[in-house]
Design a protein with these regions (language model features):
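Conserved PLP-enzyme active-site core in the AAT-like
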Residues: 1, 11-212, 227-234, 239, ...
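N-terminal, charge-rich interaction modules
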Residues: 4, 217-230
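Conserved C-terminal alpha-helix-loop-beta "cap" of PLP-dependent enzymes
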Residues: 231-297
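Glycine-rich phosphate/diphosphate-binding loops and the adjacent beta-loop-alpha structural elements
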Residues: 209-214, 294-296
Length: 297
C-alpha cells in the first residue's frame, strides 16, 4: 500500500497518497483522519466520534447524491455535516461563521452534480481552512486534473480511479504527508473494510501511467464523425457536448424524435443497454428525450 501510494504521488505531485476501494471510501477515510488526526485510540472508536470535534463544514450546493448521499460517506467517517449557505448561493462570511471548536474539517466538492453558480471558490476554502488551522478535504472523484487540486493547497484530495482514469474499481487520497499518515492510520479502523486488492492496485497505477501519457484522452474532434453518422439515422440528432462541470471530457449527446423514429428515448436507451453488445448511456435527461454516450466507458 505504501509503495502504491508513492507511485500515485508521482502523478499528483503530492507529498504522499493512500489507495482505497473507491472515492466514497476515500471521503469516509479522509473525514475519519480529520477527526482522529491519526490517534490510534480514536481510530478504533470510529465512526463513533462522540465528544470529539467532528463537524464537517460544506456548502449546501455541494451536498449531492452520486448514487448515494455524500453525507453517508461523511457519517461513515464519524463526521457530522454542517451546511453553509443556501442551495444556489453562498458567501464567505457564512463559511467563516460556521467554524467552531467542534469543526474537524472543511469539505469542498467538485462535481457536475453540484450547483455550478453562486458557490465559493476553492481559493476561499483554502484560505479559511489555513486561517483556522483546519484540514481541507476536496472531493475530486471524477476530475481529470491530477495536479490542480493538490496544488490549490488542499490537505486531502479524493479521486476515483475508475472514473476519469479508467482504472479498475479503486480510489485514492492524495495530499499532505501529515494527513495521509492519518488516513493510513484508519487501516486499523474503518478503512479495514475499504481496502483495495493487489490486482486493483496494479491496475490503478497502470491506468494512471496511461493517462499521464495521454493514451486515454478522447477529443471532441474524434467524436464528430460518430455523431454525424448517428444523425443520419432518421429520428436521431447527435452533437458533441462538454462535461457539465467544465472538464475536458467530451460526449455524444443524442436527441430522439419519437414521432420520426417510432420509439422514445427510454426505448432507445433500453435497446442499447440490452443488446448483444451492451452500450450504457448517461440517462439523466431521458425525460427530455435526450441521452449521452461517454466514450470512456
Amino acid at each position: 500500500v505504501d509503495r502504491t501510494g508513492e507511485l500515485v504521488s508521482r502523478y499528483t505531485g503530492a507529498e504522499d497518497s493512500y489507495v482505497t476501494s473507491c472515492a466514497s471510501a476515500g471521503i469516509a477515510i479522509a473525514v475519519a483522519a480529520a477527526i482522529t488526526r491519526g490517534d490510534q485510540a480514536r481510530v478504533t472508536l470510529m465512526p463513533d466520534s462522540a465528544g470529539m470535534a467532528n463537524e464537517v463544514v460544506m456548502l449546501r450546493g455541494h451536498n449531492v447524491d452520486y448514487g448515494a448521499p455524500i453525507t453517508s460517506a461523511i457519517r461513515l467517517g464519524g463526521g457530522r455535516v454542517v451546511e453553509v449557505g443556501s442551495s444556489n448561493l453562498a458567501a464567505r462570511w457564512q463559511l467563516e461563521s460556521a467554524i467552531t471548536d467542534s469543526t474537524a474539517a472543511l469539505l469542498y466538492v467538485k462535481s457536475h452534480h453540484c450547483v455550478q453558480k453562486g458557490m465559493l471558490s476553492i481559493a476561499d476554502f483554502v484560505q479559511v481552512a489555513q486561517v483556522h488551522n483546519l484540514p481541507l478535504i476536496v472531493d475530486a472523484a471524477a476530475e481529470e486534473d491530477l495536479h490542480a487540486w493538490v496544488a490549490s493547497g488542499a490537505d486531502m484530495v479524493v479521486y476515483s480511479g475508475a472514473k476519469a482514469f479508467n482504472a479498475p474499481t479503486s480510489g485514492f487520497i492524495t495530499g499532505k504527508k501529515q494527513w495521509i499518515a492519518a488516513c493510513k492510520a484508519q487501516h486499523h479502523g474503518i478503512a479495514r473494510a475499504m481496502k483495495i486488492g493487489k490486482e486493483n492496485m496494479v491496475g490503478l497505477v497502470y491506468a494512471l501511467e496511461n493517462y499521464h501519457q495521454g493514451q486515454t484522452v478522447v477529443t471532441a474532434e474524434a467524436l464528430r464523425p460518430v455523431a454525424q453518422a448517428i444523425s443520419e439515422i432518421r429520428g436521431l440528432d447527435a452533437d458533441i457536448e462538454q462535461d457539465e462541470a467544465g472538464r475536458a471530457i467530451w460526449r455524444i449527446r443524442i436527441r430522439v424524435n419519437a414521432q420520426e423514429l417510432g420509439m422514445d428515448a427510454y426505448a432507445v436507451e433500453a435497446q442499447l443497454r440490452e443488446g448483444d453488445i451492451a452500450i450504457y448511456a448517461r440517462r439523466y435527461n431521458l425525460h427530455q428525450g435526450v441521452f449521452s454516450l461517454d466514450p470512456r466507458t
